[in-house]
Amino acid sequence: MLFVPRKTKHSKSFKGRISGNTKGGSELAFGQCGLKALEPCRLTSKQIESARRSISRSLRRVGKVWIRVFCHVPVSKKPVDVRMGKGKGSTEMWVCKVQPGRILFEIGGVSVELAREAFRKAQSKLPIKCSFVEEGF
Protein backbone atom coordinates (compact mmCIF):
# COMPACT_ATOMS: atom_id res chain seq x y z
CA MET A 1 0.00 0.00 0.00
CA LEU A 2 2.07 2.90 -1.27
CA PHE A 3 0.82 6.42 -0.69
CA VAL A 4 0.61 7.90 -4.18
CA PRO A 5 -2.23 9.94 -5.69
CA ARG A 6 -4.51 8.29 -8.24
CA LYS A 7 -4.81 11.37 -10.41
CA THR A 8 -2.89 14.65 -10.49
CA LYS A 9 -3.36 17.97 -12.22
CA HIS A 10 0.34 18.30 -13.05
CA SER A 11 2.72 15.40 -13.61
CA LYS A 12 5.90 17.21 -12.48
CA SER A 13 6.64 19.90 -9.91
CA PHE A 14 9.41 22.25 -8.85
CA LYS A 15 11.83 21.23 -6.12
CA GLY A 16 11.05 24.15 -3.81
CA ARG A 17 12.19 24.66 -0.24
CA ILE A 18 10.71 23.69 3.12
CA SER A 19 10.73 26.81 5.29
CA GLY A 20 9.03 27.80 8.52
CA ASN A 21 6.83 25.80 10.86
CA THR A 22 3.67 23.98 9.88
CA LYS A 23 0.51 26.06 9.55
CA GLY A 24 -1.92 23.21 10.17
CA GLY A 25 -1.84 19.64 11.39
CA SER A 26 0.11 20.39 14.55
CA GLU A 27 -2.60 19.26 17.00
CA LEU A 28 -3.97 15.78 17.71
CA ALA A 29 -7.25 15.29 15.85
CA PHE A 30 -8.14 11.58 16.06
CA GLY A 31 -6.10 9.59 18.59
CA GLN A 32 -4.76 10.08 22.11
CA CYS A 33 -1.04 9.92 21.20
CA GLY A 34 0.92 11.17 18.22
CA LEU A 35 4.33 11.39 16.56
CA LYS A 36 5.36 14.97 15.78
CA ALA A 37 8.13 15.99 13.36
CA LEU A 38 10.80 18.31 14.76
CA GLU A 39 12.75 18.90 11.54
CA PRO A 40 11.86 19.74 7.93
CA CYS A 41 12.25 16.92 5.41
CA ARG A 42 10.80 15.15 2.40
CA LEU A 43 9.25 11.85 3.49
CA THR A 44 8.91 9.24 0.76
CA SER A 45 5.95 6.91 0.48
CA LYS A 46 8.22 3.95 1.27
CA GLN A 47 9.38 5.55 4.53
CA ILE A 48 5.80 6.25 5.61
CA GLU A 49 4.76 2.68 4.77
CA SER A 50 7.74 1.24 6.67
CA ALA A 51 6.88 3.28 9.77
CA ARG A 52 3.21 2.27 9.49
CA ARG A 53 4.13 -1.42 9.37
CA SER A 54 6.40 -1.01 12.38
CA ILE A 55 3.58 0.63 14.36
CA SER A 56 1.07 -2.05 13.33
CA ARG A 57 3.40 -4.85 14.39
CA SER A 58 4.04 -3.20 17.75
CA LEU A 59 0.33 -2.78 18.49
CA ARG A 60 -0.54 -6.39 17.57
CA ARG A 61 -3.99 -5.57 16.13
CA VAL A 62 -5.00 -3.50 19.15
CA GLY A 63 -6.11 0.11 18.78
CA LYS A 64 -6.25 2.22 15.64
CA VAL A 65 -3.56 4.06 13.64
CA TRP A 66 -4.15 7.27 11.69
CA ILE A 67 -1.66 8.49 9.08
CA ARG A 68 -1.80 12.30 8.93
CA VAL A 69 0.53 12.86 5.96
CA PHE A 70 0.16 11.94 2.28
CA CYS A 71 2.68 11.95 -0.57
CA HIS A 72 1.43 14.29 -3.28
CA VAL A 73 4.67 15.82 -4.62
CA PRO A 74 6.35 14.00 -7.53
CA VAL A 75 10.16 13.82 -7.63
CA SER A 76 11.71 13.30 -11.05
CA LYS A 77 15.09 11.76 -11.83
CA LYS A 78 17.04 11.29 -15.02
CA PRO A 79 18.62 7.89 -15.74
CA VAL A 80 22.30 7.20 -15.08
CA ASP A 81 24.75 8.03 -17.93
CA VAL A 82 22.43 10.56 -19.57
CA ARG A 83 23.82 13.89 -20.72
CA MET A 84 22.53 17.20 -19.44
CA GLY A 85 19.51 18.75 -21.09
CA LYS A 86 16.83 17.04 -23.19
CA GLY A 87 14.05 17.79 -20.72
CA LYS A 88 13.16 16.84 -17.20
CA GLY A 89 13.36 13.21 -16.13
CA SER A 90 10.46 10.89 -15.39
CA THR A 91 8.81 10.60 -11.97
CA GLU A 92 11.00 8.50 -9.69
CA MET A 93 9.03 8.67 -6.41
CA TRP A 94 6.38 10.57 -4.50
CA VAL A 95 7.21 12.59 -1.40
CA CYS A 96 5.47 14.58 1.31
CA LYS A 97 7.04 17.87 2.36
CA VAL A 98 6.97 17.89 6.16
CA GLN A 99 7.51 21.06 8.17
CA PRO A 100 8.51 21.12 11.85
CA GLY A 101 5.54 20.66 14.17
CA ARG A 102 3.54 18.42 11.85
CA ILE A 103 1.78 15.37 13.33
CA LEU A 104 2.78 12.33 11.26
CA PHE A 105 0.94 9.45 12.97
CA GLU A 106 -1.72 9.11 15.65
CA ILE A 107 -2.71 6.12 17.78
CA GLY A 108 -5.92 5.60 19.74
CA GLY A 109 -7.30 2.85 21.96
CA VAL A 110 -4.02 1.65 23.50
CA SER A 111 -2.03 2.43 26.63
CA VAL A 112 0.44 5.30 26.61
CA GLU A 113 3.40 2.98 27.26
CA LEU A 114 2.54 0.76 24.28
CA ALA A 115 2.04 3.80 22.04
CA ARG A 116 5.36 5.30 23.15
CA GLU A 117 7.17 2.03 22.34
CA ALA A 118 5.46 1.75 18.93
CA PHE A 119 6.43 5.33 18.04
CA ARG A 120 10.01 4.72 19.20
CA LYS A 121 10.29 1.86 16.70
CA ALA A 122 8.61 3.87 13.95
CA GLN A 123 10.92 6.84 14.57
CA SER A 124 13.94 4.69 13.70
CA LYS A 125 12.44 4.14 10.23
CA LEU A 126 12.14 7.88 9.56
CA PRO A 127 15.02 10.20 8.55
CA ILE A 128 14.10 13.01 10.98
CA LYS A 129 13.92 13.67 14.71
CA CYS A 130 10.41 13.24 16.12
CA SER A 131 8.75 13.69 19.48
CA PHE A 132 5.97 11.85 21.27
CA VAL A 133 2.89 13.95 22.07
CA GLU A 134 -0.08 13.09 24.28
CA GLU A 135 -3.59 14.42 24.47
CA GLY A 136 -3.90 17.24 26.99
CA PHE A 137 -0.28 18.47 26.74
UniProtKB/Swiss-Prot annotation:
- PROSITE patterns according to UniProt: RIBOSOMAL_L16_2 (PS00701)
Q: Which UniProt keywords apply?
A: Ribonucleoprotein, Ribosomal protein, RNA-binding, rRNA-binding, tRNA-binding
Please indicate if the UniProt record lists Cell wall biogenesis/degradation as a keyword. Answer: no
Q: Name one GO cellular component term.
A: cytosolic large ribosomal subunit
**Entry GO MF terms:** rRNA binding; structural constituent of ribosome; tRNA binding
Q: Which GO terms describe its biological process?
A: translation
Judging by the UniProt lineage, the source's domain of life is Bacteria
**InterPro entries (UniProt xref):** Ribosomal_uL16, Ribosomal_uL16_bact-type, Ribosomal_uL16_CS, Ribosomal_uL16_dom, Ribosomal_uL16_sf
Which protein family is it in? Answer: Belongs to the universal ribosomal protein uL16 family.
- Purpose of the protein: Binds 23S rRNA and is also seen to make contacts with the A and possibly P site tRNAs.
Query: What's the subunit arrangement here?
Result: Part of the 50S ribosomal subunit.
Q: What is this protein called?
A: Large ribosomal subunit protein uL16
Q: Which organism is it from?
A: Anaplasma phagocytophilum (strain HZ)
